């Protein structure tokens, strides 16, 4: 049975970054994720400026940076806009497929062991170690386990159990997001979205209790919608023919 100082469940940006810093300090780290990288993630792909605090990321911008956003427009339900322009970037545009995979590579380059394509089934905290069982039947031990797999990872479930919190998330507490990215070319992006790469958000489009977005990359446009799962279920109950994918296309 392989033993690690730390096992990180989830190799997204949070998990990969934790694995990177731990491995850099000489820790033996296992980075476990149910997906195989590179993989897509439903997301607008905008990084807040606090990303500048991570030296290993900003020193390698060329590995994944798509564009810098200097302007944002937020539209209300009736399309009334609030326009904001900044002299400095107020967020950075990336594509999750490339960004997440790059962060995993940084962690592996520092010595972390990537275990991909298999999910954590369960784990048990003992006095001297943590025993983690994977879905493929393998067992790993570690001194510490970190949960970075999102709302449904095994660590977050255990915390909810210990704290006597509900074991199941309510539909109104979980968001459903749909997006797509379309290649439109740099000439189009420069002409329509400008060098400031204006990005837009639309609150309560057609009274949907959520928002839509349009984030402009280098040559790609990322468009999506997001809202609580409870809203999606209600819309489908009221109209069985309602389809969220068609809704996204209509929004575009």
Identify the function of each model-found stretch.
Residues 14, 37, 152:
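Conserved Rossmann-like nucleotide-cofactor binding loop
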Residues 4, 26, 142-143:
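Short, well-ordered alpha-helix to beta-strand connector turns
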Residues 106-252:
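Predominantly flavin-linked oxidoreductase catalytic cores and closely associated redox partners
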Residues 49-102:
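A conserved beta-strand/loop capping segment in the N-terminal third of enzymes
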Residues 23-42:
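Glycine-rich FAD pyrophosphate-binding loop
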Residues 1-14:
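Beta1/beta-strand and adjacent pyrophosphate-binding region of the FAD-binding site
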């Amino acid at each position: 049975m392989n033993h690690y100082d730390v096992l990180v469940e989830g190799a997204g940006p949070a998990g990969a970054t934790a694995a990177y810093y731990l491995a850099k300090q000489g820790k033996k780290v296992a980075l476990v994720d149910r997906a195989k990288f590179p993989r897509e993630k439903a997301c607008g792909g905008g990084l807040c400026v606090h990303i500048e605090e991570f030296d290993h990321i900003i020193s390698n911008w060329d590995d994944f940076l798509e564009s810098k956003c200097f302007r944002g427009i937020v539209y209300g339900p009736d399309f009334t806009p609030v326009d904001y322009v900044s002299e400095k970037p107020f967020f950075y545009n990336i594509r999750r497929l490339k960004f997440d995979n790059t962060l995993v590579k940084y962690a592996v380059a520092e010595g972390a062991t990537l275990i991909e394509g298999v999910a954590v089934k369960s784990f048990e905290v003992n006095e001297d170690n943590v025993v983690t069982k994977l879905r493929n039947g393998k067992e790993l031990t570690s001194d510490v386990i970190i949960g970075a797999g999102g709302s449904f990872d095994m660590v977050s479930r255990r915390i909810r159990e210990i704290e006597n919190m509900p074991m199941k998330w309510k539909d109104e507490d979980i968001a459903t997001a749909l997006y797509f990215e379309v290649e439109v070319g740099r000439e189009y992006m420069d002409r329509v979205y400008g060098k400031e790469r204006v990005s837009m958000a639309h609150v309560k489009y057609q009274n949907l209790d959520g928002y839509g977005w349009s984030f402009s990359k280098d040559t790609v446009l990322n468009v999506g919608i997001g809202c609580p799962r409870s809203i999606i279920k209600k819309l489908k109950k009221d109209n069985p023919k309602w389809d969220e994918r068609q809704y996204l296309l209509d929004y575009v």
